[in-house]
Swiss-Prot record:
Protein family (similarity comment): Belongs to the PDGF/VEGF growth factor family. Snake venom VEGF subfamily.
Protein name: Snake venom vascular endothelial growth factor toxin ICPP
Natural source organism: Macrovipera lebetinus
Positions where Pyrrolidone carboxylic acid occurs in the chain: 1
Any GO CC annotation of this UniProt entry: membrane
Primary site of residence: secreted
Entries under InterPro entries matching the protein: Cystine-knot_cytokine, PD_growth_factor_CS, PDGF/VEGF_dom, PDGF/VEGF_growth_factor
Cysteine-cysteine disulfides: 14-56, 45-91, 49-93
UniProt GO BP: induction of positive chemotaxis; positive regulation of angiogenesis; positive regulation of endothelial cell proliferation; positive regulation of mast cell chemotaxis; response to hypoxia; sprouting angiogenesis; vascular endothelial growth factor receptor signaling pathway; vascular endothelial growth factor signaling pathway
Iron is among the record's keywords: no
């Protein structure tokens, strides 16, 4: 069965969608411990824009608290803790940064 164009177009649009992100990618300084789960599902902007010069960009964000198990591999001890993650609440197609322009601040949920 062929998926109709309006459905294809809508599903590919720039929007916040559930995305799996690695906890260590979000918290790179926490490399000495193991996390369970090792990744979490959060809403992040992704999708296609109508022009290659545009990029799907978050224009609204909020922080969500998630309970994660932290395991210390040296002592084999574990504890539950609350970690903060950034979720995107609104997305827009915005102009891409030109090469050589400085990056903005790294997205940190803390």
């Amino acid at each position: 069965q062929v998926r109709p164009f309006p459905d294809v177009y809508q599903r590919s649009a720039c929007q916040a969608r559930e995305t799996l992100v690695s906890i260590l990618q979000e918290y790179p300084d926490e490399i000495s411990d193991i996390f369970r789960p090792s990744c979490v599902a959060v809403l992040r902007c992704s999708g296609c824009c109508t022009d290659e010069s545009l990029k799907c960009t978050p224009v609204g964000k909020h922080t969500v608290d998630m309970q994660i198990m932290r395991v210390n591999p040296r002592t084999q001890s574990s504890k539950m803790e609350v970690m903060k993650f950034t979720e995107h609440t609104a997305c827009e197609c915005r102009p891409r940064r030109k090469q050589g322009e400085p990056d903005g601040p790294k997205e940190k949920p803390r």
